[in-house]
Amino acid sequence: MNKAPTTLIIMDGFGLTGPGPGNAVSLAQTPQLDRLFAEYAHTTLSASGLDVGLPAGQMGNSEVGHTNIGGGRVVFQDLPRISRAIDDGSFFENAAYNKAMDDCLEKGSSLHLYGLLSDGGVHSHIQHLYALLQMAKNKGLTRVYVHAFLDGRDVSPTSGRDFVSACRDKCQALGVGKIATVMGRYYAMDRDNRWERVQLAYDAMVYGEGIQNPDPVDAVAQSYANDVTDEFMEPVVCDPEGTISDNDSIIFFNYRPDRAREITRAIVDPGFDGFQREYFPTTYVCNTEYDASMPNVLVAWPRIPVKNGLGEYLSSMGLTQLRIAETEKYAHVTFFFNGGVEKQYPGEDRVLVPSPKVATYDLQPEMSAREVCDKCIERINSGAYDVIILNFANCDMVGHTGVLQAAVKAVETVDECVGRVVEATLKMGGIAMVTADHGNAEVMLQPDGSPMTAHTTNLVPFILCGAGTQLRPGRLADIAPTILDVMGLAAPQEMDGQTLIVK
């Protein structure tokens, strides 16, 4: 017998705010969403700050959003967890950090600290680097090198120079640490197997190959002079003595896993074959668990399990579910949605649609949305699934480029696809929910008119199609209990989210 699915459509990076010259959501032609808002119950959800387990006022992101949606509870995130440990002193007792630093003392080797140098809070926080530098000083380490990955996505595209300058000042004030390399996250933090990019980052950090400039602040200024902003800055070697070698210790201070895996695997995995390189042993600390299969690493902050999240709970009830997205957001509807667990539950099917191979997504704002849409509708029509979780990546990934017209096109593409998926779901007698994990495309311009590439703290929509009811405002953690509610199922006690349906 065909199943009538409950379909959750996540429009990644689609926030709500008033119309304006930089609002790609309001500038776009969105006949499908306009119709859904007019015809069905809808409300707004908080997707940032304390409501998703982040510090107050901190913008949400895809990892956090999907973890909260899938968990059906506010999941305390790595950023406040680590920051709190700095405040209470337990950070400096961390076993993995201590092992890395003690190995340097014992072997007379170097300590390398690398990660995203910004206060964006999505992948890392500069204050965590400063705490590691302080810890290295406390332990009497002298050979300490910082490899700075510039951001330009979660913060202003030209804020990198100030962060590099601040980092250099901090090293000088502490009397420990030198900036050895500087490069854009485009190279060091790829997540799409673009090994030619990762190799440039690797070659700079390990072999000292790349542009040479002893002044890291000037290196960033030179990049700006060439019209290359932080994210895309080519790797620059500032201190040729600061290369990574045998028996050195490395602490990768990013806590978000998805963009930390590739460069980590290149260094720690003897079987790595993404590009030619010699393998050598290091003491390597991943700030969090980047991948359960990663060999030869220590994990500083092991994951706190999210028990009985939506995926696990549906599976335990013998129900079927589909997760579908293109490459850029596949980890989010699987790994993050399942609470940071790679495990695929019984009854859970997954469909990965490759993202287009373009340098930046403003060049193809449609991305692979229509292919995701087509494959999803095929699966809906199969009648095989009780629940379908679907992500459209466009508003977020194109929003990050800062190109307004491309973001408008992205919104319009998502609008078309959402309309088709909702229609297919309702045709099967199912219920469709349309929401987002955080904002982005609704603010494409800074107040001064320059491009805005970061996420926002704006509310996100929630539309319930196919169930005549009244909804209350809520937060992302309330989505899973709402899904269970419309299916006539009680939420497990671990979920502290509440149904959005007004009883």
Indicate residue ranges for each PLM-predicted region.
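Feature captures the catalytic ectodomains and active-site-proximal regions of enzymes
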Residues: 1-503
